């Protein structure tokens, strides 16, 4: 009836008003708000190590119980390195190590990848020389990226190598040999001493973020036969931890070197 329609219109009007008031700037604009930004100002507050010299006693007392819990999680040693490892293009000891770990982890998930790829942008810290803690691993791989496995044709793998060349290098596993130019062109590509067969199929271990075609590695969007293992153990930092722990159980230190996987000519 008429009264019902009027009530419904009132309710709808109230709802629209609520959206306008509580929505984002886009919602406000859509509702033709009369308000406009008259001026804007900003300032920069640098929060860095300078504050460590004079810690606030009250704040330190407040976080103390939480700090103990964090330390208990971050300080356990998982292994040792032979030297400090850092990242850098076109290749580095740390990026080589992480790409190799991707391949190494394949057996944990019933996979036999022929190569591994680890994006430089996902490496956020260096590894120290000597003892390495869980916290060190978290600093290197702070994101919840997960290992995954996929297949590319040889033609698409060559496209991937061209994209890696264009970016000046990414983390690639042992057996990959790329020759690139200073301006990011791919000159030659080999895998385990063999030319890439355009008609072949190649199994690759990488991170899910990379497999989605991010970091300008769009060749991964052509992937097939994707295997994304579930579970917490699939997080990249836990995969890295297990590698260190296995080495430690054998009394071995973790070592990685630059070996000419990506050469600029």
What do these predicted regions represent?
Residues 6-20:
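Bacterial N-terminal signal peptides that target proteins for export
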Residues 33-48, 97-99, 103-105, 111-116, ...:
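Feature captures C-terminal
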Residues 40, 44-126:
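Hard-cation-handling environments
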Residues 1-5:
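Intrinsic-disorder-associated, low-complexity terminal segments enriched in Asp/Asn/His/Tyr and depleted
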Residues 27-30:
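C-terminal motif of bacterial Sec signal peptides marking the signal peptidase cleavage site
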């Amino acid at each position: 009836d008429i009264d019902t329609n009027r009530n419904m219109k009132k309710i709808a009007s109230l709802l629209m008003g609520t959206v306008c008031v509580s929505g984002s700037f886009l919602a406000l604009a859509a509702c033709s708000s009369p308000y406009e930004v008259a001026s804007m100002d900003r300032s920069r507050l640098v929060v860095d190590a300078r504050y460590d010299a004079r810690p606030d006693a009250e704040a330190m007392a407040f976080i103390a119980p939480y700090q103990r819990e964090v330390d208990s999680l971050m300080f356990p040693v998982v292994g040792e390195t032979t030297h400090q490892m850092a990242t850098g293009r076109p290749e580095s000891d740390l990026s080589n190590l992480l790409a190799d770990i991707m391949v190494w982890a394949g057996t944990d998930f019933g996979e036999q990848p022929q190569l591994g790829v680890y994006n430089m942008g996902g490496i956020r810290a260096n590894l120290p020389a000597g003892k390495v803690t869980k916290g060190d691993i978290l600093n290197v791989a702070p994101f919840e990226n997960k290992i995954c496995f996929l297949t590319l044709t040889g033609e698409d793998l060559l496209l991937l190598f061209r994209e890696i060349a264009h970016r000046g290098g990414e983390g690639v596993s042992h057996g990959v040999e790329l020759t690139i130019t200073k301006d990011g062109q791919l000159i030659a590509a080999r895998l385990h001493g063999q030319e890439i067969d355009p008609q072949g199929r190649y199994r690759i271990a990488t991170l899910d973020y990379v497999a989605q075609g991010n970091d300008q590695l769009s060749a991964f969007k052509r992937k097939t036969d994707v295997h994304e293992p579930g579970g917490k153990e699939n997080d990249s930092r836990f995969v890295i931890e297990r590698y260190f722990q296995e080495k430690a159980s054998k009394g071995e230190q973790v070592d990685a070197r630059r070996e000419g996987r990506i050469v600029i000519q």
